[in-house]
Amino acid sequence: MGSGTAPKGRRNHTPTHIKCRRCGKRSYNIKKGYCASCGFGRSRRMRKYSWSHKWKKKRNLL
């Protein structure tokens, strides 16, 4: 039939992302080995960009 629900049902049920050791968010990719939120595992510096203002709001810098 189609390639909708059935292939998704056969997918592996282990989580892609787990809790990050540095930022605490559930965005550490097990296969890639780095955090999508803070960049842990890829760089020593915290991942932040000028186009992303949530981190500024969190620290009351705006």
UniProtKB/Swiss-Prot annotation:
Gene3D superfamilies: 2.20.25.30. The keyword Transferase does not apply. GO terms for molecular function: rRNA binding; structural constituent of ribosome; zinc ion binding. This is Large ribosomal subunit protein eL37. It holds the Pfam family Ribosomal_L37e. The gene is rpl37e. GO terms for cellular component: cytosolic large ribosomal subunit. Its cofactor is Zn(2+). InterPro entries: Ribosomal_eL37, Ribosomal_eL37/eL43, Ribosomal_eL37_CS, Ribosomal_zn-bd. GO terms for biological process: translation. It comes from Thermococcus onnurineus (strain NA1). A zinc finger (C4-type) spans 20-38. Binds to the 23S rRNA. Keywords: Metal-binding, Ribonucleoprotein, Ribosomal protein, RNA-binding, rRNA-binding, Zinc, Zinc-finger.
